[in-house]
Amino acid sequence: MITVNVDLGDRAYPIHIGAGLIGRAELFAPHIKGSSVTVVTNTTVDPLYGDALRAALAPLGKHVSTVVLPDGEAYKNWETLNLIFDGLLGERADRKTTLVALGGGVIGDMTGFAAACYMRGVPFIQVPTTLLSQVDSSVGGKTGINHPLGKNMIGAFYQPQAVIADIGALTTLPERELAAGIAEVIKTGAIADAAFFDWIEANVDALNRRDPAALAHAVKRSCEIKASVVAADEREGGLRAILNFGHTFGHAIEAGLGYGEWLHGEAVGCGMVMAADLSVRLGLLDDASRQRLDAVIAAAHLPTRGPALGDARYMELMRVDKKAEAGAIKFILLKRFGDTLITQAPDEAVFATLAHTTR
């Protein structure tokens, strides 16, 4: 087992990475102070790992209940969030009840938001079961739900007590979900660590075939990088925005097609292709680097052409992005691997990118 710590100055929490961790009671025990635990999961993950988690919690002597939600990005909304509150109130959960998020990014985001809201804040633990959630969404305290007009527009910054990333859970991940997670690994290397990006290029085939050592390294290094960024800028006042590379275009794709049509990581992968194209057009990035990024995204079996939503629709959706200010779209662009720039772009350049990178 590898442990990466997220140090926020006045508080910290561990990210435990390894195989078989869902069944290890000693990893959960230090973070559960009250007499009850509510596991929040979905209809896909609960049959796979729900019993193992509940068996691990049993020796702790806590009352354990489970809320099982429908699976998918389409359910990341108020109605589904209320199902969590219904479960908590039905169990008479109190302020010391610990929520455990067992699932991917949707479950983690909604459980964290529920924990932030219920009785104005209860503790929660992340148990991410997808590669995307292990390398990205479970770390850093971003929680929330979608709105029809924009992704993750309603939420809170609320940190978990711990993240328990069981690499073994990735063996049951569908191929599309695996590729979606690799997209966030690629993003992390591209924005923050050129040497890690080189490693990803050399090992993308190993990641595709779920080589345990490659997956463990990808999760570890991604978590180390994200932990350092979050420690420097917990609430996304500046530096942390670089983690949104590919997300301005990507969120527009998700909202424009309807949540769940493309996986989040698929949209981010394509969004990185689009952002790199815009970076070249603005004279920030050399074309050889753009080609390298495009190639590794394609090698991870991710889409490299965006849907034809139309220029006006893309612009409308990107203006709803959380980074936008007074309606001005802000992009995270590449100068070189490991070096980014947060900037606006002329509409003409954006239109040229859309013409070149969408169907």
UniProtKB/Swiss-Prot annotation:
What keywords appear on the UniProt entry? Amino-acid biosynthesis, Aromatic amino acid biosynthesis, Cobalt, Cytoplasm, Lyase, Metal-binding, NAD, Nucleotide-binding, Zinc
Annotated Gene Ontology cellular components are:
cytoplasm
Entry-linked Gene3D superfamilies: 3.40.50.1970, Dehydroquinate synthase-like - alpha domain (1.20.1090.10)
Which lineage ranks, top first, belong to the organism behind this chain? Bacteria, Pseudomonadati, Pseudomonadota, Betaproteobacteria, Burkholderiales
InterPro entries noted in UniProt:
Dehydroquinate_synthase (IPR050071), DHQ_synth_AroB (IPR016037), DHQ_synth_fam (IPR030963), DHQS/DOIS_N (IPR030960), DHQS_C (IPR056179)
Q: Recorded GO terms, molecular function?
A: 3-dehydroquinate synthase activity; metal ion binding; nucleotide binding
Q: Does the keyword Cytoplasm apply?
A: yes
Any idea of its EC number?
Answer: 4.2.3.4
Report residues binding Zn(2+). Answer: E184, H247, H264
Pfam families given for it?
Answer: DHQ_synthase (PF01761), DHQS_C (PF24621)
The protein's name? 3-dehydroquinate synthase
User: Which organism does this sequence originate in?
Assistant: Burkholderia multivorans (strain ATCC 17616 / 249)
Pathway(s) it belongs to: Metabolic intermediate biosynthesis; chorismate biosynthesis; chorismate from D-erythrose 4-phosphate and phosphoenolpyruvate: step 2/7
